A protein has these predicted regions:
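Carbohydrate-active catalytic/glycan-binding domains of CAZyme proteins
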Residues: 1-265
């Protein structure tokens, strides 16, 4: 399909620099784009923002800015610091918002948080910490959990995320919860001890991560992710843009029902 520009970044102020990680979602009869952006005068003041389209076709409809994602009235923490990579999912008639946000002084840590949504652009509940970079493979270069994505299957919710710096060490982890559990209770989620997808030197695929899930024309699940084709990067990998979009078919484990992430697919 032909690319269509639906919005342009501001020339100054908020939403004027580092426009990152857009996701398109359909909620309550309208289209929404969730993205992160910075400020030309403070380029690392990355915060989450929302665009809305009330027309049936998001390619031709008019988009309006809903501004910065709103936190719950009792929440004094969410979106105060570097926040990005938001995704949205529905379960049992409720919508949930998951995002990455940094905490700490000096060497900062990027955690994943979840909140129930009151509207498509405001949270209903105070944020809940889902996962922090606990393991060594989540702490290479930087201590990072980011890029959440959700897929449902057979009564289970699978939440993938990306970890470590964005070079060859970048990889995917996963959390799992029962769809009937309290998704705002961290105890409902089980975290995989090891990455579910990582660098495969034999295939020349390095640092896979920040994936999303969609379906092909026949309704089969497909994962879209980015990865590098070179192992070595000069300088800080954060400033190296050479990451490529890739596709992977998703199969399901016959015993556990969990998604299988395999380069063979």
């Amino acid at each position: 399909a032909e690319e269509v520009t639906v919005w342009e970044k501001h020339k100054e102020g908020i939403m004027s620099e580092h426009i990152w990680a857009p996701e398109l979602h359909y909620l309550d009869g309208k289209w929404y784009i969730y993205f992160a952006g910075g400020d030309k005068d403070d380029i690392w003041a990355i915060r989450p923002y929302v665009l809305e389209c009330a027309d049936a076709d998001p390619l031709t409809g008019a988009w309006t800015e809903k501004g910065k994602m709103g936190r719950a009235d009792a929440d004094e923490f969410s979106f105060e610091a570097f926040s990005l990579d938001a995704t949205v999912f529905e379960n049992k008639g409720k919508h949930y918002y998951v995002w990455a946000e940094k905490v700490g002084v000096g060497k900062q840590i990027s955690n994943l948080y979840i909140g129930e949504m009151e509207t498509p652009y405001k949270l209903k509940t105070v944020q809940v910490l889902l996962t922090s970079p606990d393991y060594d493979w989540e702490r290479v270069g930087f201590w990072v959990n980011e890029g959440p994505a959700v897929i449902h299957h057979d009564g289970r919710i699978y939440l993938t995320y990306s970890a470590s710096e964005t070079g060859a060490a970048y990889c995917m982890g996963m959390l799992t919860a029962d769809e009937d559990s309290d998704l705002l209770d961290p105890k409902s989620w089980t975290k995989e001890r090891y990455p579910v997808l990582r660098t495969d030197d034999s295939r020349g695929i390095y640092g896979p991560g920040h994936n999303s899930f969609t379906e092909d024309e026949e309704g089969n699940p497909v994962m879209v992710y980015h990865a590098r084709t070179e192992a070595e990067i000069e300088g800080n990998p954060l400033y190296n843009p050479n990451r490529h979009a890739m596709l992977m078919k998703i199969r399901w484990d016959e015993k556990t029902g969990a998604p299988i992430f395999s380069y063979e697919d």
